[in-house]
């Protein structure tokens, strides 16, 4: 169980480092522009400080990652959340086994737990106040 939780933690850490939102400075046709770009959804961006917001498509613009980004608080927050989620998941399964619950009841509990995790994602991805 400990090895599984360790593997889960490390794999999620790798996913966060590769697939999380990236803050970029985009040098385009106009003045430099600060964007927050999601690598999860193609062409999904939000303008942070742009006088002329335009979509990024392909290699039309040079994208440079900000040098002063600090992802560790976000990574720690995600890892702690998923550690608590893993404990809740294991507790739910143990509770179902101990009480001899039917499979449908157990699946309803796990489904509810998954919905709660899904609803918590926007809160987890909120940036820390500076």
Swiss-Prot record:
Signal peptide residues on this chain, from the entry's feature table: none
Disulfide bonds: none
GO CC entries: host cell membrane; membrane
Keyword Transmembrane: yes
UniProt membrane topology term: Multi-pass membrane protein
Transcription is among the record's keywords: no
Transmembrane segments: 4-24, 75-95, 109-129
Source organism, top-level taxon: Viruses
Locations listed in the record: Host membrane
Keyword annotations of the record: Host membrane, Membrane, Transmembrane, Transmembrane helix
Main location: host cell
Main function: Plays a role in virus cell tropism, and may be required for efficient virus replication in macrophages.
Family that this chain belongs to: Belongs to the asfivirus MGF 110 family.
Protein's recorded name: Protein MGF 360-1L
Organism name: African swine fever virus (isolate Tick/South Africa/Pretoriuskop Pr4/1996) (ASFV)
């Amino acid at each position: 169980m400990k090895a599984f939780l360790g593997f889960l933690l490390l794999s999620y850490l790798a996913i966060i480092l590769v697939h999380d939102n990236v803050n970029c400075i985009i040098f385009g046709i106009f003045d430099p522009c600060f964007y927050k770009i999601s690598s999860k959804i193609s062409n999904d961006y939000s303008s942070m400080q742009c006088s002329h917001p335009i979509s990024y498509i392909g290699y039309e613009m040079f994208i440079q990652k900000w040098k002063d980004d600090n992802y560790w608080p976000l990574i720690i927050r995600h890892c702690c959340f998923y550690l608590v989620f893993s404990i809740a998941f294991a507790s739910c399964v143990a509770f179902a086994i101990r009480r001899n619950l039917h499979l449908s009841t157990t699946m309803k509990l796990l489904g509810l737990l998954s919905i709660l995790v899904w609803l918590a994602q926007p809160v987890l991805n909120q940036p820390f106040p500076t």
